[in-house]
Each structure stands twice: as structure tokens, then as C-alpha cells.
């Protein structure tokens, strides 16, 4: 058993059994210890203390790599002990708190590290349960990966005081990422039972992990059920700033039913989807004047390889902004 210190305001340690997993894809405690130390040194340590961790000859990280190369458990334990003592000293003298106070947005590697810790402890051991979906229905499971999601947050300008909603939120990855990376109020709705159960496990672990890392995330809300019928989701959509809909595998019927909900969304709300709700050649005309899609101004964007879980290749996504001005202008032009 090895204890690795977190950089928060309490006496929190993560406990690790130094075992080698049978399967190469299973959780590797030694790798996680190294990654925790790497992440802490990059995000929590003031510049004037960085050399103790980063020095290429004598730094904690270099000594840790040397211990691994020597396959020496005693050497490894000694380095982790020195790391723990350094973190405790910096925590007590206020250096870590000062560093955190100057950080206004978490960088993506830290976000990914925390999300990976959560996922590996909750979803990974039970991932087989997610394979029980039906092709050709709306209940096909697939994940948008953290780097792609971070790009979406930047493209939409999502801010901490805003509201994010993920319709079809699966195991809750994106809901948690929005609350962690942006610090905003974050909602998700999912109807697949297995995914919902894993999402709730992730949410519990998320709260514990944020405490360990000394981070105050936005509030998360995970709702079980049909997002077209759940009243809490219908209500939050009216005040949402950014809505994510991974509609890659949705049936045309569900996509059409979703469109009617756009009427109640506020001006300026941005809807991000993998399939556009507005046909490419669509124009506002007198015969389609009452169509909800006339309220949407759409821009197309590209995502690159390794952005989604179901394919390695890139693709396109769409950001639709609710903007009634074009419809008003057309109506006025008709007299």
C-alpha cells in the first residue's frame, strides 16, 4: 500500500495497492501515482518551487522514473514519501492556495486526468453493461471525447455563470466536464438504465475527486428519463445557454420531435449537434413560415481524429444559435 498526497486543503491521500494488472487495459496504480504527481507539479506548484519537482537530475519526477527503471519498490516508496512531505509543506505555508487563487480556468490535461480517474474507478470495471444497446434505435451508446468537448466549450464561449445541458448524456462524462472545466451549472438527461446507474456512480466519485484536488466545480444534475417528457429538463431548456445533442444515431422521428422544443429556448441559446437540424439548402419562405428551424442560424465546424469513441476519423458538427431576427425581417418584408 502506498499513500499519495493530493494538493488540497485537507489531509487527503489516495491509497494505492502496488499491483500489476492482468489485463493491459485495467487500472494501473503505479501509472496513476506518476500521473497524479505529474499533474500536481504542473498545476499546483508555484514557479519558485518547481525545480524540486522538475529538475532533470534531482527532481521528484526524475527520481520516480529512475525508481521505476530500477524496479525498486523501496526507492519508489521513498520518492513518494518525499513528494508527500513537499506537498504538505507547500499546503501549510499557503503556496498551493495562492497558486490556485491565480488560476481562473483549469487546463485540459488536468481536466482529463481527473475525468480519467473517475471513469477508471466507476465505468471501466462495468463497461460491458453499456454494450446492451439496440442498433437502429435512439438508444445507441457513443461518447464524445474530452478534447472535442473542450473545443465545443471554446466555440460556444460557455462561461461559469451559464447553464449547460446534455440531452442523451450517457454515463455523464460531458456533464461532469462542463462543471469541472468551466464551473457552470450542468445538466444531463439519459434514459438507458445501465448508463444512468454508471452516471450516478461517476457523479459521486466526481464530488470526492474534486474535494481531493481542491476544486469547486459547478453544480451537476443528472436526470433519468425521456428528455422530451421530463419536466425538470423541459424547464431548464428554457434558460439553457448551451445545449449538446449527440444525435449521430438518433432516428429522424426523434430529431423532428426535438425541433419543436427549440421554440421555448431563449434567444442566443446555442445548440451543438452532430447532425444539423436545418437542411443545407433551407430558406425561409411563406409556405414554411411557422417552422421552428427558421429560428436557427447554423454554422458548420469540423472535428478531428480521436474526437469520438466510435471512429478514429474526423467529421462535422453544427452549432445552431436561436436568432429570431431573420424570421422577423422576412415577416416584415412581406408587409
Curated annotation (Swiss-Prot):
PANTHER family found in the cross-reference section: HISTONE H3 METHYLTRANSFERASE (PTHR21451), HISTONE-LYSINE N-METHYLTRANSFERASE, H3 LYSINE-79 SPECIFIC (PTHR21451:SF0)
Enzyme class, UniProt record, top EC level: transferase
One GO term describing the cellular component: nucleus
Enzyme Commission designation: 2.1.1.360
Chain's role: Histone methyltransferase that specifically trimethylates histone H3 to form H3K79me3. This methylation is required for telomere silencing and for the pachytene checkpoint during the meiotic cell cycle by allowing the recruitment of RAD9 to double strand breaks. Nucleosomes are preferred as substrate compared to free histone.
PROSITE patterns linked: DOT1
Record keywords: Chromatin regulator, Methyltransferase, Nucleus, Repeat, S-adenosyl-L-methionine, Transcription, Transcription regulation, Transferase
Protein family per UniProt: Belongs to the class I-like SAM-binding methyltransferase superfamily. DOT1 family.
Top-level taxon of the source organism: Eukaryota
Binding site for S-adenosyl-L-methionine: 141-144, 164-173, 190, 226-227
Domain (DOT1): residue spans on this chain: 14-335
Biological processes per GO annotation: DNA damage checkpoint signaling; DNA repair; methylation; subtelomeric heterochromatin formation
GO MF, any single term: histone H3K79 trimethyltransferase activity
Miscellaneous comment in the UniProt entry for this protein: In contrast to other lysine histone methyltransferases, it does not contain a SET domain, suggesting the existence of another mechanism for methylation of lysine residues of histones.
Reactions the enzyme catalyzes: L-lysyl(79)-[histone H3] + 3 S-adenosyl-L-methionine = N(6),N(6),N(6)-trimethyl-L-lysyl(79)-[histone H3] + 3 S-adenosyl-L-homocysteine + 3 H(+)
Identification of the protein by name: Histone-lysine N-methyltransferase, H3 lysine-79 specific
Activity control, per UniProt: Ubiquitination of histone H2B to form H2BK123ub1 is required for efficient DOT1 methyltransferase activity on histone H3.
Record flagged with keyword Repeat: yes
Species this chain originates from: Aspergillus oryzae (strain ATCC 42149 / RIB 40)
UniProt-annotated location(s): Nucleus
InterPro entries: Dot1, DOT1_dom, H3-K79_meTrfase, SAM-dependent_MTases_sf
Amino acid at each position: 500500500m502506498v499513500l499519495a498526497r493530493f494538493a488540497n486543503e485537507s489531509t487527503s491521500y489516495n491509497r494505492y495497492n502496488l499491483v500489476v494488472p492482468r489485463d493491459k487495459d485495467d487500472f494501473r496504480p503505479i501509472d496513476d501515482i506518476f500521473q497524479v504527481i505529474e499533474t500536481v507539479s504542473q498545476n499546483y506548484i508555484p514557479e519558485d518551487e518547481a525545480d524540486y519537482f522538475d529538475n532533470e537530475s534531482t527532481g521528484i519526477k526524475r527520481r520516480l522514473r529512475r525508481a521505476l527503471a530500477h524496479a525498486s519498490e523501496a526507492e519508489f516508496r521513498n520518492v513518494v514519501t518525499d513528494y508527500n512531505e513537499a506537498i504538505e509543506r507547500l499546503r501549510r505555508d499557503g503556496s498551493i492556495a495562492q497558486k490556485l487563487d491565480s488560476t481562473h480556468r483549469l487546463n485540459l490535461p488536468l481536466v482529463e486526468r481527473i475525468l480519467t480517474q473517475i471513469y477508471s474507478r466507476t465505468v471501466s470495471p462495468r463497461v460491458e453493461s453499456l454494450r446492451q444497446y439496440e442498433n437502429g434505435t435512439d438508444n445507441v451508446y457513443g461518447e464524445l471525447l474530452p478534447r472535442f468537448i473542450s473545443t465545443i466549450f471554446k466555440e460556444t464561449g460557455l462561461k461559469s455563470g451559464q447553464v449547460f445541458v446534455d440531452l442523451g448524456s450517457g454515463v455523464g462524462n460531458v456533464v461532469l466536464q462542463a462543471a469541472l472545466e468551466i464551473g457552470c451549472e450542468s445538466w444531463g438527461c439519459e434514459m438507458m438504465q445501465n448508463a444512468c446507474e454508471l452516471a450516478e456512480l461517476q457523479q459521486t466519485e466526481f464530488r470526492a475527486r474534486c474535494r481531493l484536488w481542491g476544486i469547486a466545480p459547478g453544480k451537476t444534475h443528472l436526470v433519468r428519463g425521456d428528455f422530451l417528457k421530463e419536466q425538470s429538463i423541459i424547464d431548464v431548456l428554457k434558460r439553457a445557454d448551451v445545449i449538446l445533442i449527440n444525435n449521430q444515431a438518433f432516428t429522424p422521428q426523434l430529431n423532428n420531435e426535438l425541433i419543436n422544443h427549440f421554440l421555448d429556448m431563449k434567444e442566443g441559446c446555442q445548440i451543438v449537434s452532430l447532425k444539423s437540424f436545418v437542411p443545407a439548402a433551407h430558406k425561409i419562405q411563406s409556405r414554411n413560415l411557422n417552422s421552428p428551424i427558421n429560428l436557427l442560424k447554423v454554422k458548420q465546424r469540423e472535428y478531428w481524429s480521436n474526437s469520438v469513441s466510435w471512429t478514429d476519423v474526423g467529421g462535422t458538427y453544427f452549432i445552431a444559435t436561436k436568432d429570431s431576427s431573420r424570421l422577423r425581417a422576412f415577416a416584415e418584408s412581406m408587409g
